[in-house]
A protein has these predicted regions:
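PLP-dependent amino-acid enzyme catalytic core
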Residues: 1-272
Length: 272
């Protein structure tokens, strides 16, 4: 499977997810006076995160044989909820197993159990959990729903960029948070195809600048020894799919913990 996405891939993903995930709002922000800054409110997704786009995109694209074998994912956060919600959207007919660390908060595990999925708490660390999930995939032939290393997932994440470009065709810059990079790969493909002059700017915490360092080295750092950060959801290594789309990324901005704190306060006080 090619690691490069096309606009057609993103549009096809939108058709798959559209029945369950309508577009999220694009709203002006009051947090940056004098700047036409708009927020793509992915917090309005049913699971509170854009991750559900990619999970549903992949899971709804499976053929009959793949569906019988089921899917599995390892996650301690938003991706797990996205996979669980996608399973519900598909009527519970797709056997879905979600692996979470034994140390995962019980409130989060309880939320996952509300969906038609088999939740398995395995391993003391996230790496242990991933190892268990990989063993399960090998034993069962289930399809892996990776958080970012699958073009069907990245295409699903890219539907957010498609919505922005269609709603705001004069957009000059998109600021995209980057962890593994599935979001920026999909968003960049869609936005650049529809708005050729748009600048795609990756944003990472200085506790985990894996993309910046990968670009400097000329190879993706698949794992990265991130320091503790408020933006823990984007900590860690960069994926191969994201790195394959590095030509579409115009700049990488690295922010400090103090800047992240200031941004959170500004958003809460000005944009609620």
């Amino acid at each position: 499977m090619s690691q490069r996405l096309t606009l057609e891939d993103v549009r096809a993903a939108r058709e798959r997810i559209r029945p369950s995930l309508p577009p999220t709002p694009l709203r002006p922000s009051l947090a940056a006076p004098g700047v036409d800054l708009r927020l793509k409110l992915e917090c309005w997704q049913p699971t509170g995160s854009f991750k559900v786009r990619g999970a549903l995109s992949l899971m709804s694209a499976l053929g009959e044989v793949e569906r019988r074998r089921g899917v599995a994912a390892a996650s301690a956060g938003n991706h797990a909820l996205g996979v669980a919600f996608a399973a519900q959207c598909l009527g519970g007919a797709l056997p879905t197993t979600v692996f979470v660390p034994a140390s995962a908060p019980q409130a989060k595990v309880a939320k996952l159990r509300r969906f038609p999925v088999d939740v398995r708490q395995v391993g003391e660390t996230y790496d242990d959990t991933v190892e268990s999930a990989e063993a399960f995939l090998g034993e069962t032939g289930a399809t892996s729903v990776h958080a970012f290393e699958d073009t069907r997932v990245a295409a699903g994440q890219g539907t957010a960029g498609l919505e922005v470009a269609e709603e705001c065709p004069d957009v000059g810059m998109l600021l995209v948070p980057v962890g593994g990079g599935g979001l920026i790969a999909g968003v960049a493909v869609a936005a650049k195809a529809l708005v050729p002059g748009v600048r795609i700017v990756a944003v990472q915490p200085d506790a985990s600048p894996a993309l910046r360092e990968s670009l400097a080295l000329g190879r993706p750092l698949l794992t990265y020894p991130a320091r503790p950060t408020l933006a823990d959801g984007v900590a860690g290594g960069i994926g191969e799919i994201a790195f394959a789309h590095r030509d579409l990324i115009d700049d990488v901005v690295v922010v400090t913990e103090a800047e992240i704190e200031d941004a959170i306060v500004a958003l809460l006080s000005e944009d609620q």
